[in-house]
């Protein structure tokens, strides 16, 4: 397979200190005279020679199906007698703390917020007011000091203990999203010229991407908190980890059918008639991301297949893959294995390309 990952553009969002207004505001509000330790980084990538499902799968995993971290408050972490309003702390302050973008690798860190407003004016509480109370000493900040957490009226206080680092995935809580603002387009579908905008579809394509088979794609996204000195290293790690997550989830499916001749609850395999075989595979805690990959790659491997489809069953937290084809049970499993190997190979090559493109 040719090189999949064709090009990458990495652009950090930096404060424009050459602008006097921005420079003065940064110094007045946050005593900043240099760039923040963490910066949002926009990444645009071009891929060639793969189907839409692979790019869509990478996009989905990078955004909300890969483990990441957020700040959260442990039960009992509020000092009720000292805090302004427990309801506001739970519904407003906690939400603000959750969504502070962080770059964390150590889950043993604990922070606290102890703020008192002795002035006659409303006081703004920022993330810089969080203090570390447990865990190893930080060599580098894990969040920027500039995020608004809340406001204090004169004479009021806000005391929150046990603000800890929690691990999870974005599809269960948006604060865990590793990447944001993901979007992708197809570069090999003819588009309307810009001077014909009044005639074009909203997508800009002359042919619907739903009925075409694009093989040249552009994926864009933003990582909201990347250490300024290690931008390329962090982006490379994120992309490689996403490939490994997909490979790992696909490989777990192989275990379901590797001993297909033995009865097992996750696999139902039977002959419908003298020619057709039907396979029903139940995969626990799986999503449309993997379902779409399997469906697309199986179709590419078996163009004359009778049927392949999947259904996510939310209340059971499982995905059901159904395949019907004119083949023996053994041959059908062999074709499924070849399809899965193609998915694994795609993301192994993509992972290798990441190392080649991002130094």
From Swiss-Prot:
Keywords: DNA-directed RNA polymerase, Early protein, Host cytoplasm, Transcription, Viral transcription, Virion. It comes from the Viruses. One of its GO terms (molecular function) is protein dimerization activity. Induction: Expressed in the early phase of the viral replicative cycle. InterPro entries: RBP11-like, RBP11-like_dimer, RNApol_insert_sf. Pfam families: RNA_pol_L_2. Signal peptide: none annotated. One of its GO terms (biological process) is DNA-templated transcription. It is found in: Host cytoplasm; Virion. Transmembrane segments: none annotated. Disulfide bonds: none annotated. One of its GO terms (cellular component) is virion component. In the N-terminal section; belongs to the archaeal RpoD/eukaryotic RPB3 RNA polymerase subunit family. Component of the DNA-directed RNA polymerase (RNAP) that catalyzes the transcription in the cytoplasm of viral DNA into RNA using the four ribonucleoside triphosphates as substrates. Part of the viral DNA-directed RNA polymerase that consists of 8 polII-like subunits (RPB1, RPB2, RPB3, RPB5, RPB6, RPB7, RPB9, RPB10), a capping enzyme and a termination factor. This is DNA-directed RNA polymerase RPB3-11 homolog. It comes from African swine fever virus (isolate Warthog/Namibia/Wart80/1980) (ASFV).
């Amino acid at each position: 397979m040719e090189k999949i990952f064709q090009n990458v553009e990495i652009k950090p969002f930096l404060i424009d200190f050459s602008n006097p207004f921005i420079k003065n505001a940064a110094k007045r509000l946050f005593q900043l005279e240099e760039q923040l330790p963490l910066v949002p980084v926009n990444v645009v990538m071009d891929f060639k020679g793969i189907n839409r499902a692979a790019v869509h799968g990478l996009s989905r995993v990078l955004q909300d199906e890969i483990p990441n971290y957020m700040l959260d408050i442990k039960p009992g972490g509020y000092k009720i007698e000292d805090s302004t309003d427990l309801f506001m702390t739970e519904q407003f302050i906690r939400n603000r703390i959750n969504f502070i973008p962080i770059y964390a690798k150590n889950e043993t860190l604990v922070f606290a917020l102890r703020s008192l407003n002795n002035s006659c004016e409303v006081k703004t509480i920022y993330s810089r007011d969080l203090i570390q109370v447990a865990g190893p000493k930080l060599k580098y900040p894990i969040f920027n000091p500039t995020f608004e957490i809340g406001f204090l009226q004169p004479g009021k206080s806000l005391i929150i203990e046990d603000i800890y680092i929690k691990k999870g995935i974005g599809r269960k809580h948006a604060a865990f999203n590793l990447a944001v603002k993901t979007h992708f387009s197809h570069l090999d579908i003819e588009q309307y010229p810009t001077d014909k905008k009044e005639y074009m579809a909203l997508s800009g394509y002359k042919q619907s991407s739903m009925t075409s088979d694009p093989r040249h794609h552009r994926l864009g996204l933003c990582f909201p908190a990347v250490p300024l000195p290690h931008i390329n290293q962090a982006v490379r790690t994120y992309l490689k980890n996403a490939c490994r997550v997909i490979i790992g989830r696909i490989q777990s499916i192989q275990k379901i059918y590797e001993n297909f001749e033995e009865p097992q609850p996750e696999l139902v395999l039977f002959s419908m008639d003298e020619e057709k075989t039907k396979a029903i595979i139940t995969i626990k805690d799986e999503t449309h991301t993997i379902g779409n990959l399997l469906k697309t790659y199986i179709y590419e491997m078996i163009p004359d297949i009778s049927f392949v489809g999947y259904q996510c069953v939310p209340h059971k937290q499982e995905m059901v893959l159904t395949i019907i084809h004119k083949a023996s049970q053994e041959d059908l499993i062999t074709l499924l294995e070849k399809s899965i190997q193609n998915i694994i190979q795609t993301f192994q090559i993509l992972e290798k390309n990441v190392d080649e493109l991002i130094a």
